[in-house]
Design a protein with these regions (language model features):
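A short acidic, glycine-rich active-site loop
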Residues: 56-72
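Gly/Ser-rich helix-loop-strand patches that form or flank binding pockets
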Residues: 20-29, 99-145
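Structural beta-alpha unit
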Residues: 1, 25, 29, 41, ...
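A structural preference for short, hydrophobic beta-strand core positions in alpha/beta folds
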Residues: 36, 88-91, 139
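Short beta->alpha connector loops
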Residues: 13-14, 93-97, 117-118, 159-160
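Residues on a specific face of well-ordered alpha-helices
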Residues: 75, 124-128, 167
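Small/aliphatic-rich secondary-structure junction motif
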Residues: 1-57, 132-135, 144-183
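Short, contiguous strand/loop micro-motifs
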Residues: 9-11, 61-65, 87, 113-114
Length: 183
């Protein structure tokens, strides 16, 4: 058992380098194909003094800004990924959670930052992603560049979901210094 395809989600409002570095490290460790992914959605309503309205010109400006940022993220991803790692890029101007959930069907592991989940138009909803993707999700701190699984703690509940989560995480447990289980 191994991860053959890893998706790394680049949040539109976060620095991309740390999460890309984690993705590269995991792809090299498992010999996996790395997919860089980014998405953001234009909010359909714009707040004005008269309330929430549809404003086509403002929405187009926001879409242009999103497309520009997606191009910047792609450039960083392509610059950072070494030629020894096979990779590809995917982006969309749509819901980041929905896009990542759909793209996850072609991956064995999803790597994403914890991000700012308050803006569903610009950040992934971790809860919805975890429940809807059907794939293991590794959530990293925003500034984390390396995976250090020295100690693994297993909180166990004898359910199908818990057994699946433990099975999905087994690859990370090959080399921890200690493995603990709460009593």
């Amino acid at each position: 058992m191994s991860y053959k395809s890893i998706i790394v989600n680049l949040a539109i409002d976060e620095a991309p380098a740390p999460i890309v570095q984690v993705g590269i490290e995991l792809a090299e460790r498992f010999g996996a194909h790395l997919v860089g992914l980014a998405a953001a959605e234009v909010p359909p309503l714009v707040p004005t003094g008269e309330g929430m309205v549809y404003e086509g010109e403002i929405m187009q400006i926001q879409r242009t800004e999103i497309e520009k940022r997606l191009a910047e993220l792609r450039a960083v991803f392509e610059r950072m990924v070494p030629v020894s790692v096979t990779s590809e890029w995917a982006q969309s101007v749509c819901s980041p959670t929905r896009f990542l959930s759909v793209m996850a069907r072609a991956a064995d592991l999803i790597v994403t930052g914890c991000g700012d989940g308050d803006n569903v138009f610009r950040a992934v909803d971790i809860g919805s992603l975890t429940l809807g993707a059907g794939r293991p999700v590794l959530v990293t701190a925003g500034n984390m560049e390396h995976i250090r699984a020295k100690t693994v703690l297993v909180a166990w509940k004898d359910t199908r979901e818990a057994r699946r989560a433990v099975a999905d995480a087994l690859l990370f447990w090959k080399r921890p210094a200690t493995l603990s289980s709460p009593r």
